[in-house]
A protein has these predicted regions:
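Small/polar beta-strand repeat architecture
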Residues: 1, 107-245, 272-280, 284-289
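Short hydrophobic/aromatic-rich beta-strand motifs
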Residues: 71-79, 85-92, 142-148, 162-170, ...
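Residue-level signal for tight coil/turn positions that link beta-strands
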Residues: 93-94, 101, 125-127, 172-176, ...
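N-terminal beta-propeller domains
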Residues: 1-113, 204-236, 267, 290-378
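Hydrophobic or amphipathic alpha-helical targeting/insertion segments
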Residues: 106, 174, 253-277
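Surface-exposed, low-hydrophobicity beta-strand/loop segments enriched in small/polar/acidic residues
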Residues: 32, 95, 241-245, 258-260
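Short, intrinsically disordered, charge-balanced linker/junction segments flanking boundaries
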Residues: 105, 111, 193, 248, ...
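Active-site-adjacent structural elements in enzyme catalytic domains
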Residues: 251-252, 261, 272-273, 285-305
Length: 381
């Protein structure tokens, strides 16, 4: 009996019976993890886990696998012009991280650094909770700190105390907080650690650290009878956060511009290396009238203006004013740090009319798409 060619039509038919498909077929009636190319089924491309390794307190790569800290909100991959290295920047709800050469580097900006703390570490025998004393530290619950220079205390090793990635804190009072280390102390020490430096990462005060938005805004929030009847509570008092923590991340050449939603704008210089953290754009020597607060940012293409949405207004004569959730501002062309409009540059601003706040901005082929909560705008230069 001669062979007969059976040519199946592409696609999966599920809305009629298998018998009925043969009337105009044959058709495929079931599949799993396939796609059709040139009329023929082929298996879907897969994925491979990317192994990343942790760093020790000295910043050297180890053989210990690790994962990113926090819920990833934004990732941007690029290959640097200067050294040809592949890099991935990841903004999570509480960190800004770089994956380079298979290792995980923390470039989260710093809020402040306390140096020369004398024996600020206290341990309790059998407990993994360690108390740090730093007067007027300014940290809030959920913030992160990185300790360096600490010596072994109460049986807790120096490597544990001086962890490269640091620790999330529990605030005790204005002068102290606690961290949880991997191994329990073997003795109680009221004051130890030697001369210690503590770096405080930006956190709650900089709009970073909220894993989810808080929908609990209606009747029944909090305990029954809390405060006086009809008295409105502030967001801070109520613990209410309308937006979760997120990032806008764009490349400026091979460098990184990153903005915390409802927070500040930061810059990371690739050529400076992963031992350096991102810094405020407003702290650069060339900075002029940079917004300190923005909902979102984007670099326009192909003209290269740096655009901020839902940001602080420009104050004539220099500086910034109040936040306007519908205001769009942009830097002068080819300089992300200069935002004061003059007759010789292209910086400027425009307030949008439809909506109450800017939600997102995306750089498209010939324009920048700006979305408010009620409208979509297209912006060109």
């Amino acid at each position: 009996m001669p062979l007969q060619l059976l040519k199946y039509n592409p696609g999966i038919v599920k809305d009629v019976t298998e018998y009925a498909t043969g009337k105009n077929g044959p058709f495929w009636v079931d599949s799993d993890l396939v796609r059709f190319k040139n009329g023929y089924p082929e298996k879907l491309g897969g994925w491979q886990k990317d192994t990343i390794f942790a760093l020790n307190p000295s910043g050297n790569i180890t053989s210990t696998e690790t994962t990113i800290e926090g819920i990833a909100r934004r990732m941007v991959y690029w290959r640097s012009n200067s050294d040809g290295e592949d890099r991935l920047v990841v903004g999570t709800h509480n960190h800004l991280l770089i994956i380079e050469n298979g290792s995980l580097h923390d470039i989260t900006p710093l809020r402040k650094t306390s140096t020369g703390l004398s024996n600020p570490i206290a341990t309790t025998d059998g407990s993994t909770t360690v108390v740090i004393t730093d007067n007027t530290h300014g940290a809030e619950n959920g913030d992160w700190v990185v300790i360096s220079g600490a010596s072994a205390t109460g049986g807790v090793s120096a490597d544990d105390l001086n962890s490269y990635y640091g620790y999330q804190i529990t605030r005790i009072n204005v002068n102290s907080y606690s961290i949880v280390v991997p191994s329990a102390a073997t003795s109680t020490v009221a004051s130890g650690g030697g001369t210690v430096t503590v770096k405080y990462l930006i956190g709650v005060g900089a709009e970073l650290g909220s894993q989810s938005s808080d929908p609990a805004l209606g009747f029944g929030v909090g305990g029954w009878g809390e405060e006086a009847w009809g008295t409105p509570r502030s967001d801070a008092l109520a613990g209410v956060n309308l937006d979760n923590s997120s990032w806008s991340i764009d490349l400026w050449g091979e460098d990184v511009l990153a903005t915390v939603r409802n927070g500040a704008i930061y810059y990371w210089d690739t050529s400076a290396g992963v031992t350096n953290r991102a810094v405020l754009v407003s702290s650069l020597s060339s900075a002029n009238s940079v917004p300190n607060v923005a909902r979102t940012t984007v670099v326009s293409f192909p003209d290269r203006h740096f655009i901020a949405g839902g940001c602080q207004a420009y104050v004539v004569g220099g500086g910034v004013g109040n936040v306007d959730n519908m205001l769009v501002r942009w830097s002068t062309q080819e300089d992300f740090s200069v935002w004061n409009p003059t007759s010789t540059n292209t910086a400027g601003d425009q307030r949008l009319q439809v909506g109450t706040k800017i939600i997102a901005m995306v750089s498209a082929r010939e324009e920048t798409i700006i979305s408010t909560d009620e409208a979509i705008y297209g912006m060109t230069f």
